[in-house]
Amino acid sequence: MTEEKKYKVLARKYRPQKFEDLIGQELLVKILSNAINNERLAHAYILTGVRGVGKTTTARLIAMSINCKNRDKKNCEPCGTCDSCKSTTSDSNLDVIEIDAASNTGVDDIREIIDNVKYKPVIGDYKIFIIDEVHMLSKSAFNALLKTLEEPPELSLIHI
């Protein structure tokens, strides 16, 4: 028994780890790279499309690139080796919070996000919230999220 292998679903095992690995998203990558390079990031990004086009993957790559300590300045690729990149990849980064809105549809779930938004980042430069399947939120949960989307605290980014 040399090493215990950890099971990963295929979607996570082969999830792109660099912007160049995003197939069919060249224009999006160019726009995001320019925004990151010029330090002109929006406080929120809405990524839309059919299932499987890479919305969540893109949000995670943005988070990795923004908080990466050794980011390639030319093309904004995250290094994948710094503490921030490794912890984002392993879903243990305290500054990248991913919420599945399909399972957490209520106002209390969104209020938990709103409470976390006010805290400063721990490891990286930004605290990033990825709200997956946001269309599943209840109307009251959307209303609770609206003010935070309109006026987010400094150093916080929200991807929905």
Please tell me what each predicted stretch does.
Residues 1-157:
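P-loop/Walker A NTP-binding region and its immediately flanking N-terminal helices
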